[in-house]
């Protein structure tokens, strides 16, 4: 049985791909007492700060659920009935509207925008956050540069609610690049209050203590064990989520995750092995969901030192058998 955004989680349990985690704010409260969703995954969240050097992919969910961006991608129901991003649609998030010219992007922020602590979101917060992504280097800087966002001098505060990006070159990727997780907007007042001379960008503080405006807040984080989200009751970038609390537990063993799901001890299990997914697909009360994997490159790299991969025809046959579409 396929589900759409509104009927998602009507069944007792679901096995999904990890990319569903960013959709937490869209889940209806129909599991675990209608208030709490319990999920298990095999991966480990190693930081709550996506800009921090070494932050891994499982941690991206924190940036999406706890922080907002100027804009976001739309969503759509895929042909198989599952929820997916719609990369052809750019929607406002912190921004209320924007204007595009050949020289610049000018954003008007929502006057109602608030961080989790009630502090108003300003253009100064956006600039500080963008400056930080570039200054810390590594992947955040690479991602920003993919949209020709390369120099802090490009980012200009016009007034509290007006933020301008001066374009160094025309690029069709600039606006979409603002909707990916990296250009998250941080509460600069909180961050600066916890910065030091040795750590001017508050990486140690934000590593464990997010300062965002997203649909969820981090209630607690026990590294290697669990992450607990709680709903932002005063969310200003969209509707307040239906689900009040989400507990994401780290369970390395696929067999254990499967057992927890089958017993009804959890509502969601992520990264289900193909074998388990096939075996569970026909069980009443369980729903296997798939989602496209975003922002990733998968490669098949045979070891050419061994047969049969030294044979060009074998390599061609493998290439032709891959369903690229």
Q: How should these model regions be labeled?
A:
Residues 204, 233-279, 308, 320:
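Ligand-site clamp/hinge motif
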Residues 7-27:
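N-terminal export signals
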Residues 122-129, 160-166, 214-215, 243-245, ...:
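Alpha-helical secondary-structure segments
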Residues 94-139, 158, 164-166, 257-260, ...:
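Aromatic- and charge-enriched surface segment that lines or borders ligand/interaction sites
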Residues 23-42:
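C-terminal segment of N-terminal export signals and the immediately downstream linker at the start
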Residues 99, 143-195:
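Surface-exposed binding/hinge segments that line
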Residues 40-101, 131, 211-213:
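N-terminal lobe/hinge region of extracytoplasmic solute-binding protein
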């Amino acid at each position: 049985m396929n589900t759409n955004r509104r009927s998602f989680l009507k069944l007792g349990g679901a096995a999904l791909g990890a990319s569903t985690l960013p959709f937490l704010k869209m889940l209806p409260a129909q599991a675990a007492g209608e208030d709490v969703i319990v999920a298990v995954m095999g991966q480990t969240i190693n930081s709550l700060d996506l800009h921090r050097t070494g932050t891994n992919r499982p941690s991206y969910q924190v940036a999406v659920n706890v922080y907002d961006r100027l804009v976001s991608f739309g969503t759509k129901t895929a042909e198989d009935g599952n929820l997916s991003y719609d990369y052809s649609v750019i929607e406002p998030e912190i921004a209320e509207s924007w204007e595009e010219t050949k020289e610049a992007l000018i954003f008007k922020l929502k006057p109602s925008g608030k961080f989790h602590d009630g502090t108003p979101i300003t253009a100064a917060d956006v600039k500080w956050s963008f400056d930080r992504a570039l200054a810390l280097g590594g992947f955040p800087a690479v991602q920003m540069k993919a949209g020709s966002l390369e120099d802090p001098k490009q980012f200009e505060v016009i007034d509290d609610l007006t933020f301008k990006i001066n374009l160094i070159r025309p690029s069709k990727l600039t606006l979409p690049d603002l909707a990916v997780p990296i250009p998250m907007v941080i509460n600069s007042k909180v961050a600066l209050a916890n910065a030091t001379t040795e750590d001017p960008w508050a990486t140690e503080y934000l590593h464990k203590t997010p300062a965002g405006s997203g649909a969820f807040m981090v209630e607690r984080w026990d590294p290697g064990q669990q992450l607990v989200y709680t709903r932002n009751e005063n969310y200003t970038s969209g509707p307040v989520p239906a689900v009040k609390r989400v507990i994401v537990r780290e369970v390395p063993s696929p067999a254990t995750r499967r057992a927890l799901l089958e017993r009804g001890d959890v509502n969601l299990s992520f990264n289900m092995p193909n074998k388990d997914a096939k075996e569970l697909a026909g069980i009443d009360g369980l729903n296997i969901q798939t989602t496209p994997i975003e922002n990733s490159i998968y490669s098949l790299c045979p070891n050419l030192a061994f047969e049969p991969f030294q044979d060009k025809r074998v390599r061609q046959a493998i290439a032709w058998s891959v369903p690229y579409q």
